[in-house]
Design a protein with these regions (language model features):
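Active-site-proximal segments of metallohydrolase catalytic domains
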Residues: 1-78
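Extracellular hydrolytic enzyme modules, especially secreted metalloproteases
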Residues: 51-52, 58-182
Length: 182
């Protein structure tokens, strides 16, 4: 899937907010929903069903740099709010959410084990993944194999489920053939 972006129109005057942008909860989601029609109206765009809107909001005291509603792998539109930032990493990360991608996490086990079942001892650390754009580290590497699979770049035949100790030869995920993920 290829998505191309071109620089679109920029509002000559900012949209005035009657109150400070909400940082969390329903009010933050409501902000994203309400800003979209107003921005497109001012831009003179009536059909925005296949467009992505990037909004740079002023500082509001939020701990996040960007926010976007979760879409799906086949989404063709979305809204991204940037909190006083125009970082390409933040834009890419938030666009990932509009495509249906969650955060890259890792498994942390309190008993010093390298791996284990999800339990009281082994838990996910949100944003813990450090190898792709959906983590909390500014990287330019490809998406991890789980996110590639979610986007449809890898199909089920390229993923092997392993239930016991065995040797699996892995192919790079950008090759068309072979097992690319366990």
């Amino acid at each position: 899937r290829t998505i191309s972006f071109t620089v679109g129109k920029v509002l000559p005057e900012p949209i005035s907010l009657v109150s400070k942008m909400a940082c969390s909860g329903f009010a933050a989601s409501e902000f994203l929903s309400s800003i979209k029609p107003e921005a497109y109206k001012r831009l003179g765009i009536s059909d925005y069903s296949k467009r992505y809107l990037v909004v740079i909001a002023p500082k509001a005291g939020c701990v996040w740099s960007g926010r976007a509603p979760l879409g799906g792998p086949k989404s063709v539109s979305g809204t991204v709010a940037l909190h006083d930032s125009a970082s390409s990493y933040v834009i890419s990360h938030e666009l990932g959410h509009t495509f249906g991608l969650g955060h890259s996490n890792f498994l942390r086990c309190d008993n010093a084990a390298n791996d284990g079942a999800w339990s009281d001892t082994c838990k996910a650390v949100e944003y813990g993944g450090t190898v792709d754009i959906m983590g909390n580290i500014d990287v330019t590497t490809p998406l991890n194999t789980y996110h590639q699979w979610r986007m449809g770049y890898l199909d089920d035949s390229q993923i092997k489920q392993v239930w016991q100790s065995e040797v699996v030869n892995l192919s790079p995920s950008d090759f068309a053939n072979g097992i690319s993920a366990i």
